[in-house]
Amino acid sequence: MSQNHDPAMLAKAETLTEALPYLQRYAGKTFVVKYGGHAMGDPELAQDFAEDIVLLKAVGINPVVVHGGGPQIGRMLKALGIESRFVDGLRVTDKQTAEVAEMVLAGAINKELVSWIARAGGKAIGISGKDGGMVIARKVEAKKAPKAVADAESGDPIVVDLGFVGEPDRIDTTVIDTICKAGMIPVIAPIGVGEDGETYNINADTMAGSIAAALGAARLFLLTDVPGVLDKDKNLLTDLRPADIARLAEDGTISGGMIPKLETCVHAVEAGCEATVVLDGRVPHAMLLEIFTARGAGTLIRA
């Protein structure tokens, strides 16, 4: 028997043994992962993400991927000479813009991600919320534009119809369950269909949160471009409850785009998801560190 104990090899063995209780805990569970941000535009990070998803499937976890694509939609609209407008972070979406969004999300991005997973040795099925009537959407109510955009006479904020922007109203998980049971990985574009038969563009975080709740997922992961939720001194907050989030929003610790993300997390855990995690998608294999190590790698939100 060899007596050469390579420290690096021993460290790898210790990592595997540390993962054992988590492998046992999560076997057969469902994880919903919202994939977006910087990681989508970096081939190395995209490869790392695909490998992580395939590994989860290989160890008996059912990953369900929901992806975004706002920057890609913006680039395509610019190339086509179509102006982009936003209200409260939501894209004003007319019929033409909705068609472009569906083309980019359900076409280019979705199939590219399926290909990354295939290259990593997995089998993925690319779908959108329209397939099988999975996501029935309702139109998002008109929004008040920022105060800078006001009626010239009254000075009141102008109410803007966002067009074909929706949010999940009902979710049928049959298609997702069928794909998972077949040993494959669902990759879902955030597009839904309304009762009126119209196509609606849905915020990817919102879509992922609603799907996680409908599935009763063990985890919802939101991959972002920040380490997680930070306090005022920029230290990572590793464990939060809904009451903590309300307090942090009230005192200004969290603001901007982080607020709707955390609202999604709170809704998900209150509607059936066991826990949610906000973590840095720019860090290679951050999701594996969060799942399989005691220290974790992001901010965990529980009810």
From Swiss-Prot:
It holds the Pfam family AA_kinase. The record marks 34, 261 as: Transition state stabilizer. CDD domains: AAK_NAGK-C (cd04250). It is found in: Cytoplasm. The keyword ATP-binding applies. Pathway: Amino-acid biosynthesis; L-arginine biosynthesis; N(2)-acetyl-L-ornithine from L-glutamate: step 2/4. The keyword Cytoplasm applies. It catalyses: N-acetyl-L-glutamate + ATP = N-acetyl-L-glutamyl 5-phosphate + ADP. GO terms for biological process: arginine biosynthetic process via ornithine; L-arginine biosynthetic process. Its EC number is 2.7.2.8. Transmembrane segments: none annotated. GO terms for molecular function: acetylglutamate kinase activity; ATP binding. Substrate binds at residues 69-70, 91, 201. Keywords: Amino-acid biosynthesis, Arginine biosynthesis, ATP-binding, Cytoplasm, Kinase, Nucleotide-binding, Transferase. It is an enzyme of class 2 (transferase). One of its GO terms (cellular component) is cytoplasm. NCBIfam families: argB. Belongs to the acetylglutamate kinase family. ArgB subfamily. PANTHER family: N-ACETYLGLUTAMATE SYNTHASE, N-ACETYLGLUTAMATE SYNTHASE, MITOCHONDRIAL. Catalyzes the ATP-dependent phosphorylation of N-acetyl-L-glutamate. This is Acetylglutamate kinase. The lineage of its organism: Bacteria, Pseudomonadati, Pseudomonadota, Alphaproteobacteria, Sphingomonadales.
